[in-house]
Amino acid sequence: MTDTTNNEAPRLDLSDVEHRVGKLVGGGQLWEPCAKSDIRRWVMAMDYVNPIHWDQKFASQTKFGDIVAPQSMAVALDYGHGCQPACVGRIPGSHLIFGGEEWWWYGTHIRPGDRLVQERRFAGYKVTDTKFAGPTMFSNGDTIHRNQHGNLVAKARSTAIRYLAAEAEKRGFDFVDV
């Protein structure tokens, strides 16, 4: 919420954010297991050329014995593509920009038939005064990806950037027409 009627500095109303720090957040889980066609479509979309991900004959001759997904497939098997745990709480008058992710993989490959399950947690936030929009919140969320056997596949930390839209517009950064 922006209140500058009394020459006060604009503030983010974080009352619906603060109590969520460190807590698990909900989110959907995919119903269907990963299929070979899902892996093939993902590698085509990402333009991966390694035949271990799409060529049945080639993959059968490798140590895996079958097609395996590239590590990045974990994001495609997550509801919300990993950003969701960083985007919690209502901040009146704010806009959100996805700020990216960092990933760590643990050697468990995603195979056809696997079901990934995610545990999501709002890790925390910091507020920084920016030239762009004044008070701007950088929030982080963590997602742990496990397969149906409980094996750790990947961890991801996502960042969301939230700012007061009216303050950004006042400062000349209006993204409505972009």
Task: Outline where the language-model segments fall.
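Hot-dog-fold acyl-thioester-processing enzymes
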Residues: T2-G100, R171-V178
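HotDog/MaoC-like acyl-thioester-processing domains
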Residues: M1-E18, G100, W105-V178
